[in-house]
């Protein structure tokens, strides 16, 4: 994945989709416990760690508390939909992103910053619409240990069926508006990532496609921290809207009402609730995702025969 674009073909589509899916699975498995904590912080606010046996930071204390109450299963609650969501998310995203870059590039195959932002935004919109139901299920599964008096969901597919039956399409696509607002995240992250890669390539006197894993890790971590810090508030709003279900008290009537109530209760810091945990989770996840994608993609490009050679 480079700032320059390559002509689209079935090999590129296959390599992008397969590498994106592999990267999503690896990242989801690695960061799931921190994702559970982040989601609960966003939805229910900071926990009260009154147990004298719980020591250390809020994050460590929350991990210990969840493990004590719900076991290892609690730390990996929602792993299945997280894997499914991230697998499909990155498979769709990297494929769409590459196709849109090819469509928007100039005659000399160069991509302007504006075109890069547009490609990232378009891929983000398509991915968000396609995967929103899985993110709703993930949020519900990760927080259902804290919801009293509600029959828990048994699995990802049973949750999808039940939400569709009880709440209809609105339930499956709850939180879609703030999720689409989150397109600004990838619109910032991916062009920033591309620009940092170009800078590192020039500094190391090599091509972007020949950057090593360390360079990719540096570029992806800086881009992720920058984009996450600027766009985090929409994640809080999205998580709160997705968490409230058919059987729970309807706390928010919509995006505007949610923003108003969060601000009234917690002020501006309320929109950054769980941000530190989120950065601890998303920065390594971004490094894992982008490094895995780049390495797997290079392997596939090298080993999968091109259309012309397969015909011959």
Curated annotation (Swiss-Prot):
Keywords annotated in UniProt: Antiport, Chloroplast, Membrane, Plastid, Repeat, Transmembrane, Transmembrane helix, Transport
GO biological process, one term: NAD transport
Main location: plastid
Metal-binding recorded as keyword: no
Solcar repeat residues: 11-103, 111-199, 211-299
InterPro entries: Mit_carrier, Mitochondrial_sb/sol_carrier, Mt_carrier_dom_sf, SLC25A32-like
Intracellular or extracellular location(s): Plastid, Chloroplast membrane
Membrane topology: Multi-pass membrane protein
Regulation: Inhibited by pyridoxal 5'-phosphate, bathophenanthroline, tannic acid, mersalyl, mercuric chloride, p-hydroxymercuribenzoate, p-hydroxymercuribenzoate sulfonate, bromocresol purple and N-ethylmaleimide.
GO molecular function annotations of the record: antiporter activity; NAD transmembrane transporter activity
Record-linked SUPFAM superfamilies: Mitochondrial carrier (SSF103506)
Chain ranges passing through the membrane: 17-37, 78-98, 117-137, 171-191, 216-232, 271-293
Any single Gene Ontology cellular-component annotation: chloroplast membrane
Cited function: Mediates the NAD(+) import into chloroplast. Favors the NAD(+)(in)/ADP or AMP(out) antiport exchange, but is also able to catalyze a low unidirectional transport (uniport) of NAD(+).
Family indicated by similarity: Belongs to the mitochondrial carrier (TC 2.A.29) family.
Additional remarks: Appears to be a chloroplast envelope-located membrane protein lacking an N-terminal-located transit peptide.
Identification of the protein by name: Nicotinamide adenine dinucleotide transporter 1, chloroplastic
Organism in which the protein naturally occurs: Arabidopsis thaliana (Mouse-ear cress)
């Amino acid at each position: 994945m480079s700032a320059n674009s390559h002509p689209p073909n079935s090999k590129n589509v296959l390599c992008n989709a397969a590498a994106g899916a592999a990267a999503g699975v690896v990242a989801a498995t690695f960061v799931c416990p921190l994702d559970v904590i982040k989601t609960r912080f966003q939805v229910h606010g900071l926990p009260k760690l009154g147990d004298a046996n719980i020591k250390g930071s809020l994050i460590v204390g929350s991990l210990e508390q969840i493990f004590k109450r719900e076991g290892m299963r609690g730390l990996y609650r929602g792993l299945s939909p997280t894997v499914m969501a991230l697998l499909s998310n990155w498979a769709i995203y990297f494929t769409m992103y590459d196709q849109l870059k090819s469509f928007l590039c100039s005659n000399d195959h160069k991509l302007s910053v504006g075109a890069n932002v547009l490609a990232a935004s378009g891929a983000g919109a398509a991915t968000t619409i396609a995967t929103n139901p899985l993110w709703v299920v993930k949020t519900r599964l990760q927080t259902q240990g804290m919801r009293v008096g509600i029959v828990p969901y048994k699995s990802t597919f049973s949750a999808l069926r039940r939400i569709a039956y009880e709440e209809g399409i609105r339930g499956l696509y709850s939180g879609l508006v703030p999720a689409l607002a989150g397109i600004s995240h990838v619109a910032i992250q991916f062009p920033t990532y591309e620009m940092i890669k170009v800078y590192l390539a020039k500094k190391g006197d090599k091509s972007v496609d020949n950057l090593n894993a360390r360079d990719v890790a540096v570029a992806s971590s800086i881009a992720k921290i920058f984009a996450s810090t600027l766009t985090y508030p929409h994640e809080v709003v999205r998580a709160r809207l997705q968490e409230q279900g058919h059987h729970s008290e309807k706390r928010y009537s919509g995006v505007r009402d949610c923003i108003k109530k969060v601000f009234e209760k917690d002020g501006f810091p309320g929109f950054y609730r769980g941000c530190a945990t989120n950065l601890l989770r998303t920065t390594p996840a971004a490094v894992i995702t982008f490094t895995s994608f780049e390495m797997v993609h290079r392997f596939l490009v090298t080993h999968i025969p091109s259309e012309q050679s397969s015909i011959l």
